[in-house]
UniProtKB/Swiss-Prot annotation:
Main location: membrane
Binding site for glutathione: 39, 74-78, 114, 118, 127-131
Cofactor (UniProt): glutathione
InterPro entries: MAPEG-like_dom_sf, Membr-assoc_MAPEG, MGST1-like
Signal peptide: none
Catalytic reaction annotation: prostaglandin H2 = prostaglandin E2; 2-glyceryl-prostaglandin H2 = 2-glyceryl-prostaglandin E2; prostaglandin G2 = (15S)-15-hydroperoxy-prostaglandin E2; 1-chloro-2,4-dinitrobenzene + glutathione = 2,4-dinitrophenyl-S-glutathione + chloride + H(+)
GO cellular component terms listed in the entry, alphabetical order: membrane; perinuclear region of cytoplasm
GO BP annotations listed: cellular response to interleukin-1; prostaglandin biosynthetic process; regulation of inflammatory response
Superkingdom field: Eukaryota
Organism: Bos taurus (Bovine)
Designated name of the protein: Prostaglandin E synthase
Transmembrane segments: 14-42, 62-91, 97-120, 125-153
Gene name per UniProt: PTGES
Amino acid sequence: MPPSGLELMNGQVLPAFLLCSALLVIKMYVVAVITGQVRLRKKAFANPEDAQRHGGLQYCRNDPDVERCLRAHRNDMETIYPFLFLGFVYSFLGPNPFVARMHFLVFFLGRMVHTVAYLGKLRAPTRSLAYTLAQLPCASMALQIVWEAARHL
C-alpha cells in the first residue's frame, strides 16, 4: 500500500521531485533571460514598440539566434510541464525511492544537456539523444500512473 501523504512529506521521493522541478523551472527562467539578452545584443525585437525604443522600426525583425532561443524555450514547455504533472502524481504512488530519484535525475540531466546542446549549437545527435533520454522516465512514470489508475477502476 502506498504511504500516506504525511509519510511522503518526510520521505525521499517528493522532496527529490520538488528539488528537480524547482531547478528545471529556474532553468526555464534562465533560458528566457538569455533570449532577452540575445534580442538586445542582436537588435532583433518582436514588437515595434521595443524596436522603436532600441533604435527604430528596422530592428523589428527575426534573427536566427533569437529563434533558436525561442525554440529551446518552447521545447522546455513541451517537456517540462508534462514532467511536473507526471512526477507529482508518480510521487504519490509509493515508488521505490531510489528508482524515483533516478527517474527525476535522468529527466533533469537530460533537459540540462538538451538546453546546452540547443543554445550551444552542439553537433547532432547530442540534442536529440538528450531529448530522448529525458523522455524515457516520463514514459515510465506515465505508464505506471496509467497502470495504477486502471488497477483501481
